[in-house]
């Protein structure tokens, strides 16, 4: 019989959550690919759809007012699915060459995941990367001390975030149910939506996140006042997306899980 009154599994995102501080790899590759095509987007525009399957991300970038206008000005017509496919092929090839370099665990990840496992929690993961991309990420992350018990990519389920199907596949593989005993942890709006659409708990991370949009060097050089302002803005976006909790860094996750377990116990007691 499944345990229903405590968290059984944590499902992490990858880039910006457990590896690749600031989710720099996809952001920099999108910038490079679009610049080569003559389309110049801001970092904020590039990062906004982050967490989606990468071909869907390209469509979102082309659909921005800036992307649409620049494409028409440069090519004299609106973009097509053929254009999306060409951009995606370039993106995939470019990312494949560099993604292993960006697969270093974010500070605090290795120790925190070890602590969670010692508490008996299973560690799942979902990502906007394809299986082929993850073949470059997994060995490097493992070499540096981070592994998930299962890794689910959009090409496996045929659907990406914010749909819940990758998270459901994690649950199926790890034999964990109901969804209310799962916590989704991520660094983008679609991570939060994935968890809520699955009926799980959703937790947003600030430090190292795509939503905060800072490299580690930028984070460390920023004034405390400006950093706090940016964190507050990112936290509001998480909460607007339905986050149950927002934490400063992954080191705060064990305490967040304890808080969720407390809420679950209170709810069960109230129902008795």
Predicted regions and their residues:
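N-terminal helical cap/lid subdomain that shapes the substrate entry/recognition surface
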Residues: 4-110, 114-119, 135
